A protein has these predicted regions:
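Structured core elements
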Residues: 8-11, 55-56, 80, 120, ...
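C-terminal regions of RecA-like/P-loop NTPase motor modules
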Residues: 64-79, 106-114, 126-197
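Flexible beta-alpha connector loops of hexameric P-loop NTPases
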Residues: 33-35, 55-57, 88-101, 130-137
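Short, active-site-adjacent cap segments at secondary-structure transitions
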Residues: 17, 86-88, 125-128
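Helical hairpin unit composed of two closely spaced alpha helices linked by a short loop
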Residues: 77-120
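Cytosolic-facing regulatory segments adjacent to core modules
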Residues: 3-75, 89, 184-187
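A short beta-strand-to-loop transition that corresponds to the Sensor-1 phosphate-sensing loop
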Residues: 13-14, 83, 116, 120-125, ...
């Protein structure tokens, strides 16, 4: 947004409005309470810095074909699909991993055809629970199909309690066709603001 890119965030995991508020908090580096207490201050800033560039929409029950049509019509620069695994796709598949592979192939084609960055959000399988480093072998419900279609895969791991005070996260780049760098990065999350440091 700060660079002037048009961004679309398709939400089918959490309600779209909740995601949008979280993105606004993150953009301004503020808590939900600070946002609510200072709406007159942030409303014009939102209209200037976020509203022209960001659309957050519900994607419950949506297909990748509909995402493709939207991209052709509206020409965004970046699209997030959270979670891409839950998007429908035409065709019949014998196994879930075959359907997922085809979904990710289609997503890659959307990116190429429309010259946009396509960011697919997915979950780790149970293998990733309480793990420091989440690599692409731990992606949920996939053999190699999802990983094969991605240019970069970033896993976010966490160990220890689920308590809000556990702010350490481990970011693991396990595939990188962009510049080849792989490895872990330790970070801290400000849970109240949705910002990593």
């Amino acid at each position: 947004m700060r660079a002037g890119h048009k961004i679309v965030y398709w939400a089918n995991e959490e309600p779209a409005e909740k995601i949008k508020i979280r993105l606004v908090q993150s953009f301004f580096n503020i808590t939900r309470k600070e946002l609510e207490e200072n709406r007159p201050k942030y409303r014009p800033l939102y209209r200037e810095h976020i509203q022209p560039y960001l659309k957050v929409m519900s994607a419950v029950g949506m297909s990748v074909e509909e995402v493709d049509s939207y991209a052709k019509l509206n020409k965004p620069d970046i699209m997030f699909c959270d979670q891409l695994d839950k998007f429908r796709i035409s065709g019949e598949y014998n196994r879930g991993d075959e359907r997922l592979k085809e979904t990710y192939v289609y997503a890659r084609e959307i990116a190429k055809r429309n010259k946009l960055l396509f960011w697919a959000v997915s979950q780790a399988s149970n293998d990733g629970h309480d793990r420091q480093f989440i690599d692409y072998n731990m992606m949920d419900n996939s053999k190699t199909g999802k990983a094969g279609e991605a240019d970069i895969i970033i896993g976010i791991g966490k160990t220890g309690s689920s308590d809000v005070n556990n702010i350490v996260r481990h970011i693991c780049v396990s595939k990188n066709k962009i510049n080849g760098w792989h490895g872990p990065i330790d970070a801290q999350i400000d849970v109240q603001r949705g910002v990593y440091y």
